[in-house]
Amino acid sequence: YEIRLSLVGSEMCIRDRALCDTIAYAKSKGMFVITDGKRNDIGTTMEAYATAHLGHTDVAGESIDAFGADALTVNGYLGTDGIKPLAKICDSDDKGIFVLVKTSNPSSGELQDMKLETNESVYEHMGKMCEGWGEDLMGKHGYSAVGAVVGATYPEQLGEMRTKLPHTFFLVPGYGAQGGGADDVKNAFDENGLGAIINSSRGIMCAWKKQGLTEDDFAVAARKEAERMRDEIVGCIGKIKLG
């Protein structure tokens, strides 16, 4: 379950309360919760972000979760100085991060596709850095706590990055409302059909509109669309596993 921080609320106290309540509710239902905050900073400021979103805070001698998400989207443009504080929390609290690598928006190529002196693109180099940052945070299934955001709207690059980043779990936006489909996301998965989370926000939240229903039918429509999405993607993963 991904929570887009910018849409939770504009008033800080209301937003923070809503974020805490939403995360707590989702986790009570057994969901893995990702906060889409795209945080980036360095030093003590990033330590504060990391602690707030993923770690524990001491209050009157008691250690409590601030927000308590399982993972956080982050911007790696500040380099290792911005990732180290997050990696520390990932290690101590069994949490994860997803670094922006090749994003789904139309103008992402203005910077991310630029070629470096090594003849690799900026997004390829960022992906390589994710692999390096995750070397000491490897899980039992071969994936590290440092994941990558790679968009479904660029299926060719998505497939290339899956091959180049064998230990990096992908968060894949762009499915649904942004135009990505099951055939576009299938290459995000490894040979076992693992290694990726496919995200659809508006496609599920606004499914009642597409289905010609009313706001009162929001939950029914959202469930129906989520199940349709699941079946469609699983069908494509099956094709991969069968050759």
Residue locations for each model-derived region?
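Active-site-adjacent beta->alpha loops and helix N-cap segments on the catalytic face
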Residues: 15-25, 42-48, 78-91, 153-161, ...
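C-terminal helical cap(s) of enzyme catalytic domains, especially alpha/beta-barrels
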Residues: 185-191, 206-242
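Active-site beta-loop-alpha junctions enriched in small/polar residues
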Residues: 10, 38-42, 75-77, 102-106, ...
